């Protein structure tokens, strides 16, 4: 991507841009969905005139997402949605390519808020955003609460995560949501791939890089058995751990039980767990009473979204002392004489202690994000929707929380198959008539659960 460096940015070290560029080029080959979108929609410039404020982990994979948005005509500003998840060479490369980015690994909470606000005022000629691309809801909340005037000409927002989607639905119920929102998280090619298969690989990567501990034979407690929890349980079991699942939902608990996992409350298993992983998106999953029960050098980490799943504040206030072993690895001495090892300060372990999900699975997620941004920006563009019939059902949007249509979900899946050498079977006309579906899809009803 060739353009002048951004004049308004803040990254850790701009000299890392060349390193970041090499990594971006390597990832592009592993992100066929985004490359397909650039090739198919690029000539039409469907995001020309869009001003997208993005708040999402500033990684190499996100750099490919950003450059895809730019290739489609958008002006973009960026911040990270997590204080530890930025890859500094990725941020440098994006700044050097001309995108105002405000992100570095190891931000303070104050710096994190500063970065999000700075991006809002970094568009050319002092213009305001007209689209939001969010991960977790912090940017959405900031604009709604502090800068509501920016929503007057905003086409809408797209949200990446389970946590952020929960906040959107709550905001809608409370009458506080002011623009249309697309729930990217619940696209099948996001939740069933990023959340499950992505976490299945990146959780263990984070734990291993942080601790070098052998997982085989250990008791691992996985809090939550949604898609993220399923992926984590599979990964730990595959490494030889004895996995115990905690759940509030009887359906998820039953799924865990018939998958071969013991299901029990945290209060009952905290004393035997050697590795603890929270995946719920809820607060107070691991609290002081659990820390006090844990065996020596229990490893505690989170792969939900925010750091409130683990009561880190209690741990810091009540531990006798703490020793920083290495970045994002802290060993706390408890008053009972035992130690607890906390990873990534209770934030996302796969991004804080490793590099997050692989490029390929993020291509699935980010393809949905790009399609959502296109859909929002062109919701009233009848000519565009006639030219690209896959967008025929994407608008106009009312204020509310919407899903992308099944045809776009299938498009995302389809454009990743060649990379894996997978070939589809084609329905015959007779078969399609028998099933009552079009030969070219969509193949499943919206209520189908994959």
UniProtKB/Swiss-Prot annotation:
Q: In the Enzyme Commission scheme, what number(s) does this protein have?
A: 3.13.2.1
One GO term in the molecular function aspect is: adenosylhomocysteinase activity
Catalytic activity from the UniProt record: S-adenosyl-L-homocysteine + H2O = L-homocysteine + adenosine
Binding residues annotated for NAD(+), in chain numbering: 161-163, 195, 224-229, 247, 303-305, 350
Q: Which GO terms describe its biological process?
A: one-carbon metabolic process; phosphatidylcholine biosynthetic process; S-adenosylmethionine cycle; triglyceride metabolic process
Localisation per UniProt entry? Cytoplasm
User: Which domain of life does this protein belong to?
Assistant: Eukaryota
Q: Return the InterPro entries for the record.
A: Adenosylhomocyst_ase-like_sf (IPR042172), Adenosylhomocysteinase-like (IPR000043), Ado_hCys_hydrolase_NAD-bd (IPR015878), NAD(P)-bd_dom_sf (IPR036291), S-Ado-L-homoCys_hydrolase_CS (IPR020082)
Query: What residue intervals traverse the membrane?
Result: none
Alphabetized Pfam families for the sequence: AdoHcyase (PF05221), AdoHcyase_NAD (PF00670)
Q: What does the note accompanying the cofactor annotation read? A: Binds 1 NAD(+) per subunit.
Keywords, comma-separated and alphabetical:
Cytoplasm, Hydrolase, NAD, One-carbon metabolism
GO cellular component, as recorded: cytosol; extracellular region; fungal biofilm matrix
Copy the pathway line from the protein's UniProt record.
Answer: Amino-acid biosynthesis; L-homocysteine biosynthesis; L-homocysteine from S-adenosyl-L-homocysteine: step 1/1
Which of the seven top EC classes does this enzyme belong to?
A: hydrolase
The job of this chain, per UniProt, is described as: Adenosylhomocysteine is a competitive inhibitor of S-adenosyl-L-methionine-dependent methyl transferase reactions; therefore adenosylhomocysteinase may play a key role in the control of methylations via regulation of the intracellular concentration of adenosylhomocysteine.
Q: What is this protein called?
A: Adenosylhomocysteinase
Q: What is the lineage of its organism?
A: Eukaryota, Fungi, Dikarya, Ascomycota, Saccharomycotina
Which gene underlies this protein? Answer: SAH1
């Amino acid at each position: 991507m060739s353009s002048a460096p951004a004049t308004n940015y803040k990254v850790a070290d701009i000299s890392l841009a060349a390193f970041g560029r090499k990594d971006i080029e390597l990832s592009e080959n592993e992100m066929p969905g985004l490359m397909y979108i650039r090739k198919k929609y690029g000539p039409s410039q469907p995001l020309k005139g869009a001003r997208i404020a993005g708040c999402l982990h500033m990684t190499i994979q996100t750099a490919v997402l950003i450059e895809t948005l730019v290739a489609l005509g958008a002006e973009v500003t960026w911040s990270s949605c997590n204080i530890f998840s930025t890859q500094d060479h990725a941020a440098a490369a994006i700044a050097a390519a001309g995108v105002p980015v405000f992100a570095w690994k190891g931000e303070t909470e104050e710096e994190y808020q500063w970065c999000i606000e700075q991006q809002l005022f970094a568009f050319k000629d002092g213009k305001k955003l007209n689209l939001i691309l969010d991960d977790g809801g912090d940017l959405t909340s900031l604009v709604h609460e502090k800068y509501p005037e920016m929503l007057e000409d905003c086409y809408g927002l797209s949200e990446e995560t389970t946590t952020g989607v929960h906040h959107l639905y709550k905001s809608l119920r409370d009458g506080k949501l002011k623009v249309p929102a697309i729930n990217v998280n619940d696209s099948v090619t996001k939740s069933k791939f990023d959340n499950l298969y992505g976490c299945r690989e990146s959780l263990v990567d984070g734990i291993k890089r942080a601790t070098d501990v052998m997982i085989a034979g250990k008791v691992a407690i996985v809090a939550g058995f949604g898609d993220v929890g399923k992926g984590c349980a599979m990964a730990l079991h595959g490494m030889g751990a004895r996995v115990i699942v905690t759940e509030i939902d009887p359906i998820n608990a039953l799924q865990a039980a018939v998958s071969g996992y013991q299901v029990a409350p945290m209060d009952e298993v905290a004393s035997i767990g050697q590795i603890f992983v929270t995946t719920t998106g809820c607060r107070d999953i691991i609290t002081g009473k659990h820390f006090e029960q844990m065996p020596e050098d229990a490893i505690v980490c989170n792969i939900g979204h925010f750091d409130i799943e683990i009561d880190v504040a209690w741990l810091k206030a009540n531990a006798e002392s703490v020793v920083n072993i290495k970045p994002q690895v802290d060993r706390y001495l408890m008053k009972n004489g035992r130690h607890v090892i906390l990873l990534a300060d209770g934030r996302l372990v796969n991004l804080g202690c490793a590099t997050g999900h692989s490029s390929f699975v993020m291509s699935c997620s980010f393809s949905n994000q790009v399609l959502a941004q296109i859909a929002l920006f062109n919701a009233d563009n009848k000519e565009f929707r006639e030219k690209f019939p896959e967008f025929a059902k994407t608008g106009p949007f009312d204020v509310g929380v919407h899903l992308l249509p099944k045809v776009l979900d299938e498009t995302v899946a389809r454009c990743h198959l060649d990379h894996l050498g997978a070939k589809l079977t084609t329905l015959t006309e007779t078969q399609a008539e028998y099933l009552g579906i079009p030969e070219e899809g969509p193949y499943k009803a919206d209520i189908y659960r994959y």
